UniProtKB/Swiss-Prot annotation:
Site (Transition state stabilizer): 212
Organism (species): Aeropyrum pernix (strain ATCC 700893 / DSM 11879 / JCM 9820 / NBRC 100138 / K1)
Pfam families, alphabetized: PK
Protein name: Pyruvate kinase
Source organism superkingdom: Archaea
Length: 458
């Protein structure tokens, strides 16, 4: 058994064909991530078409997450330039050796600041600032291409939550079955709510909003951001450009804890298997990183460059599934302590999870929106639980959740939906007639939750 942790895989040039995607889905990918920072409508549409063909071939529908560019500063569209260590270079607003595309960048920067280009591959130190022109010394050189990220360590320019490209992306994806929107560089609860408002206005009623924690504001305001979001993503690559690397484990632990105590989904991202961009086997430290992430009870692990541009996208998924499966066996023998809820809905969810585990029985529920399933998943059940859902839209949402297996049965009153879920589980030989099952449904007619423990007789 692979275990309850879900795998998010980024679709890119290396994985954009239906045949590659089908292999990735069959090996355990639960959510396909499309990075809206790259490409455009034509490329995104092609990815979605390939994904639909792959789903049809495998017989499995997955979550679809659009990852927005957010308030990111980038270099211009100039030709690649080689920056040598020791060079004094000019950064200007759409001019100079390093053209920068945001005026706000120059309002933030000061003499002595460290500037990181292209995910930290190139490092500069600022020597002087004059309006929209900055002189900086190259500390670590390299070839700088167009549209690369520009970060000032420890600082974040005051940019709007959504770029013009983000708005175009959301308009395109509005009717494409997107289940999750990843909000990049989330800086506050207000930031998250502004994106949620736009998403709802475009008709994405069920799409969940996940905040990506990528900078100092996200870390310092993690409590309010987690409260405003449906989940958080720990983007370790971008965090590593703002903090010293030895701080990252503590920051990761802090974010996981703040999200867990608010019952939010946690996704860990970046560099899990980065060596596999070039090599077919992971390093020992990468294996340990994935193993420890599962023990830390991350709900999902994200592959980025490994599946988007790497040489071994299928093997990357295979290794992540293999390692997480091994870690799950350890987790099952020593489960983590669960938060003790104070609200009735969460007390009910925890009670159901613990009841099913004490009986070693399957847990089956029917959820019209996926919210009940989210509450169950927040307590990290050690066995797969089955969620009857009314539509493919909700199925894609639930697919992202720890341990959840969605079953599309149609839109019914809750008790009827639960019965339909059982019928489908029986037809697919997932639940057998002699098993004791814990079931739960909401009776709108009587205004009560119904919880049963019974031996099924099909």
């Amino acid at each position: 058994m692979r275990g309850p942790v879900k795998i998010v895989a980024t679709v890119g040039p290396s994985s954009s064909s239906a045949s590659i995607l089908a292999q990735m889905l069959s090996l355990g990918v639960d959510v396909a991530r499309i990075n809206a920072s790259h490409g455009g409508v034509e490329q995104w549409n092609s990815m979605l078409e390939s994904l639909r063909r792959a789903e049809e071939a495998v017989g499995k529908r997955v979550g679809v997450a659009v990852d927005l560019e957010g308030p990111r500063v980038r270099t211009g569209n100039s030709e690649p330039v080689k920056l040598e260590k020791g060079d004094l270079v000019t950064l200007g607003f759409m001019e100079g050796d390093v053209p920068v595309d945001a005026r706000q960048f120059f309002e933030t920067i000061d003499e002595g600041d460290i500037v990181l280009l292209d995910d930290g591959k190139i490092i500069l130190q600022v020597e002087s600032v004059e309006g929209f022109r900055v002189k900086a010394r190259v500390l670590e050189g390299g070839v700088l291409g167009p549209r690369k990220g520009v970060v000032v360590r420890g600082k974040e320019p005051d940019l709007p939550p959504l770029s013009a490209k983000d708005r175009r992306a959301l308009e395109f994806f509005a009717d494409k079955g997107v289940s999750h929107v990843y909000v990049s560089f989330a800086r506050s609860a207000e930031h998250v709510e502004k994106v949620r408002t736009v998403v709802r206005r475009l008709g994405l009623r069920q799409a969940r909003i996940f905040a990506k924690i990528e900078g100092p504001s996200g870390v310092s305001r993690i409590g309010e951001i987690a409260e405003a979001s449906d989940g958080v993503i720990i983007a370790r690559g971008d965090l590593g450009m703002h903090y010293s690397l030895e701080e990252l484990p503590e920051i990761q632990e802090l974010i996981v804890w703040e999200a867990r105590k608010r019952y939010k989904t946690v996704v860990l991202a970046t560099e899990f298997l980065s060596s596999m961009i070039e090599k077919p086997v992971p390093t020992r430290s990468e294996v340990v990183d994935i193993y420890q992430a599962v023990l830390q009870t991350a709900d999902a692990l994200m592959l980025t460059g490994e599946t988007a541009i790497g040489k071994y996208p299928v093997k990357s998924v295979q290794w992540m599934a293999k390692i997480s499966s091994r870690a799950y066996k350890k987790l099952a023998t020593s489960p983590p302590e669960r938060p003790r809820p104070t609200s009735t809905p969460y007390k009910l969810a925890l009670g159901l999870v613990e009841l099913a585990e004490s009986l070693d029985s399957p847990l089956v529920v029917y959820s019209k929106t996926g919210r009940f399933a989210e509450r169950l998943a927040s307590f990290k059940p050690l066995k797969t639980f089955y969620v009857g859902v009314p539509s493919r839209e909700v199925e894609r949402v639930v697919r992202h959740l720890w341990g959840a297996e969605p079953i599309v049965v149609g839109d019914y009153p809750y008790e009827a939906g639960l019965a339909k879920t059982y019928e489908k589980l029986r037809r697919e030989n997932i639940i057998h007639g002699d098993e004791t099952v814990v079931e739960a449904a909401w009776s709108s007619e009587r205004g009560i939750y119904i919880i049963r423990v019974r031996n099924l007789e099909f």
